Structure formats: C-alpha cells, structure tokens
C-alpha cells in the first residue's frame, strides 16, 4: 500500500507492513538460519534485527535486481556496497522527525548536523551507520599517504592507500575517507 512505499509519497512512519514482520517471525521460529532481503526505498524499522543471520539491503534494484540478489546470496558475487545513509533504530531517532512538514512541504531544521553527523554528535545507537557494509572476504589497508597534512582552503590534497584482499574470495572494496 502507498502508506508503506510508493513513488512521490512521503511516509509518516518507518514500519514494514505488520503482516511482513509476522511472516518473518514465523519463519524464524522454524528456520533460525534466515537472511532477510529488503526491497525498499528508504530505511525501515526492523524489530527482528537481532534474530536473523543476515540482512541484504537491496533497495529498489530494478529489472536486474532479482538476479543481483541471487548472485550475492549464492556467493557468485561478493557484496561490496556500503550504506549511503544511516539507518536509525526507529523513526523518532531521526533528526527531522519533529519537523516533518507533510504533503509537498520539506523542512530541514537540523542545520549542518544532518545524517550521520547528527547520530555521531548525539552519540546515538543506530541500526546501521553510514558507510556500513559486509563482505564475504577480508581486506587490509596499508601505506596510507596524504600529500598535505596542513592544507589551506585552496590546496588540493591527494590521499592514497594500498588495499589488499586477504581473504580467499574475489571481492572489491570501497575505500571511505571522511
């Protein structure tokens, strides 16, 4: 239903339909080795988060989304994505929660303390932080080099690092620098 996910529609909550949460709970009763695949356009509350073996956030994968999910679940492709947003535990943890304008009105009253900065500043627990992502393999970082450790506003800084796959599975890594 539109109240849960629809193009051009803002939700007033982060819940999944309760029938989906009940289905997940019932599946977990008979099969605790369960991985949940989410197909959603924005974060959702996950009351079952501590009871599942894994969660694959597929977002809205489009035409090839199903094949991509299958390739990850069957180990044909190594997952290498990182979250581009922080996933809060619940809607009330979101900094814009009290400022939801409704309809076609958007209000950003958080100032510069938005997204992951808000959660870091408030030292809040989140379901998953900005930049989080798992892999079937492991990587080591070495030889970090920064061209200028005391830059001015006009300076260009070049950062380089060597990334080595130390696991037994072929994979790609996204290097993150903040």
Where are the regions a protein language model picked out?
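C-terminal non-catalytic regions of proteins with extracellular/luminal or membrane-system context
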Residues: 1-178
